[in-house]
């Protein structure tokens, strides 16, 4: 029997699937975009983010697939994903679960093995990253022929919403320190909303050794080392509505250790 989250997801997904497809968008018909969505306890958020993704891609006539990598969520996220896969079809929604929580970096490694697009988009499944920015990412990539396009909270009209002052100070402080120590050539080193050429992401994954949230930081640092080009698009980051943040004391300690390791080795 489907979970309540799956039922809500089915209704939203059916509405999105019924939306008409307007004229051709800005991306080439030959291009395909694979979205990697790592999930852990995202039953409430998953139907909404998938609905928004489908809406954004459909309105822009962009060829896409959404790959859900669930790490053994105990809240029924996998069952919701199975329902979404049935609604949209396995050519659009690909559930590629793992049996337990193995970390963000390895989730991307697992997901890219199943990606058939020539571009890969990584983003959070908790609604912190709105899919409405994806067409802007694609336009930016085409205009500058960039290898990577990264969403930034710290440039132009970018910003963070829903965080208290303490968390904003910690985020700004962490980003400032990374800019001083690593000089990454990007304004938002810890962000996780990005578009990559598939072959570039594969190469970076081979080079990166970090785990968890530090993985995102190392990806940009290694990209600079390999002379990959990076474009940026200002985004609005909104704190999650459903569920709890996975950023805790252990993640902060890991971040500091990872920062020092990257400083010493790059």
Curated annotation (Swiss-Prot):
The keyword Lyase does not apply. Residues 1-31 are annotated as: Disordered. The lineage of its organism: Eukaryota, Metazoa, Chordata, Craniata, Vertebrata. One of its GO terms (biological process) is dolichol phosphate mannose biosynthetic process. Belongs to the glycosyltransferase 2 family. Transfers mannose from GDP-mannose to dolichol monophosphate to form dolichol phosphate mannose (Dol-P-Man) which is the mannosyl donor in pathways leading to N-glycosylation, glycosyl phosphatidylinositol membrane anchoring, and O-mannosylation of proteins; catalytic subunit of the dolichol-phosphate mannose (DPM) synthase complex. InterPro entries: DPM1-like, Glyco_trans_2-like, Nucleotide-diphossugar_trans. Component of the dolichol-phosphate mannose (DPM) synthase complex composed of DPM1, DPM2 and DPM3; within the complex, directly interacts with DPM3. This interaction may stabilize DPM1. It is found in: Endoplasmic reticulum. Residues 1-19 have a biased composition (Low complexity). The keyword Acetylation applies. This is Dolichol-phosphate mannosyltransferase subunit 1. It comes from Cricetulus griseus (Chinese hamster). Keywords: Acetylation, Endoplasmic reticulum, Glycosyltransferase, Magnesium, Manganese, Metal-binding, Phosphoprotein, Transferase. One of its GO terms (cellular component) is endoplasmic reticulum membrane. Signal peptide: none annotated. Its cofactor is Mg(2+); Mn(2+); Ca(2+). It comes from the Eukaryota. The modification N-acetylalanine is found at residue 2. It holds the Pfam family Glycos_transf_2. The modification Phosphoserine is found at residue 3. Binds 1 divalent metal cation. GO terms for molecular function: dolichyl-phosphate beta-D-mannosyltransferase activity; metal ion binding. Mg(2+) binds at residue 126.
